[in-house]
Amino acid sequence: LEAEDYDTEINDAQKISLDEQSGDVKIKKAGTYQLSGTLKNGSVVVDAKAAVVRIVLDNAHIRSKNSAPVYVKQADKVIITLPKGTASSLKDTASYTVDEKEEPSAALFSKDDLTINGSGTLNITASYKNGIQCKDTLKLVDTNLNITAENDGIKVRDALLIYKGSYTVKAQGDGIVTTNEKEQGNLCIDQGTFAIEAQQDGLQSAGDLTIYDGVFTVTSGGGSVHRVDTGSALQPWGEFDDHDEAVQKSQKGIKAAKNMVLYKGSYTISSHDDALH
């Protein structure tokens, strides 16, 4: 983490009232933009090549009926700050009008580095696919996120770094996942409180997974009551009937494709498959 990832000071911000906006709010230059109010149907789009942009969500509520409520198309880095005592929200719908190949595919979608910090709260309801998706590096720094997603809760390609904070994720896919299998794809957590309920993997890393400390409550695939059954049943005349009810999708509690290191922490895991894999 860098110094600016911890910085939550709001200086020289350009204030934007979303109540006065219609359609998309476009950010094309470096700077700090403080958003408040409600955008009933539109997106905040960052298209600022090689610029560092800070977006302050000050009780901001963004709804989009046809795309991502927040879309970072290009930037050197975007920092989203949630000021103390504020509660903001992002909400999309079940369909986007954009071509899927052109993206986006999450309520908060970034093609470049993204940091979310500040002790405020961000509530995300993703009815299309993912809650948060970052195609570069995502850093979550001592913040509060509540995510409900039709697919993955938090999906990151290159690296995900989490330092402190509170994270509640309910996902029909993976809870928190990194995807870059060829290089990077690491997931690192240093403290924080996590409540994850996922139909697939709770926490999944395509690379190394390192947890220094934290409190984790993870339910995957409906929990251990929906167990994987790969045994054989005794039939009349002493014969066994082989049957396989193994899940087709991965439904593990905490999973790493490479190395997994857990230094400290409290773990309560109810998983359809392996608790740790």
Residue locations for each model-derived region?
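A composition-driven surface/loop motif
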Residues: L1-H277
